[in-house]
C-alpha cells in the first residue's frame, strides 16, 4: 500500500490496484500537486461536507465513475447530484472489495455552501479508519481533541494517522500532539495547515515535537510505503 499527501487534507491511497482519495479539495487548493482533469480515482472517501473537503468530488466521481463513501446525509445529497454513493454513519463499518472502512466521530461541523450562498446541512462530521493489506490508516478529518481518541488507539493498531494541526477551525499543534499520544499510531502526519493564513503552522516543528520520532511532515506529493 502507498499513501501520499497532497496539500490541505487530501490523502491518496493506492492499494490492490485501486486508487482512493480522501477529501479531494483540489480546485482552489494552492498547495496541491494534483490536477482534477488528470486524476484517476476509483473511490472517494469524505469526512464531512465542508467545501474544502468535498472539493472536486462531483467532477472526479462523474469523470471516473468513482464510488463516493460518506456520512449518510452528505452521501444522500451527492447522490441527488448524480454520483454513485455508499452511505455510512459514525460507528459503522463496511468491508469493500478494496478494503475495510469505519467511520469514527469527529468534533466539528458539516455543511455545504452552494454557489447561491445556500448552506446545506450534511450530517455529522467523521474520521475514517481504512484498513487494507493488513495496514490501517486513520484520517481524523477536521476535529477538536476528544478523549475517545484513546479508545480509537486502544482498539486499533494504526500504522499512519493524519491529524489536523491548523488551529482556529480544528485542533492546533498542542492538542494534536496529545491526540498522537492517545492514538498510539506508528507514524503521525500533520494535515490541514498553511492553505489559508488563519491556519498557518510549522509542520516540521510539530513532527519533531512528537515523542518516539513518529512524527513525519510529508512534502506535497510525498508518499509512505506500507
Swiss-Prot record:
Name of this protein: UPF0173 metal-dependent hydrolase BH3178
Coiled-coil ranges from the UniProt annotation: none
Annotated InterPro entries: Metallo-B-lactamas, RibonucZ/Hydroxyglut_hydro, UPF0173
Organism of this sequence: Halalkalibacterium halodurans (strain ATCC BAA-125 / DSM 18197 / FERM 7344 / JCM 9153 / C-125)
Keywords, comma-separated and alphabetical: Hydrolase
GO molecular function: hydrolase activity
Family: Belongs to the UPF0173 family.
Pfam families recorded: Lactamase_B_2
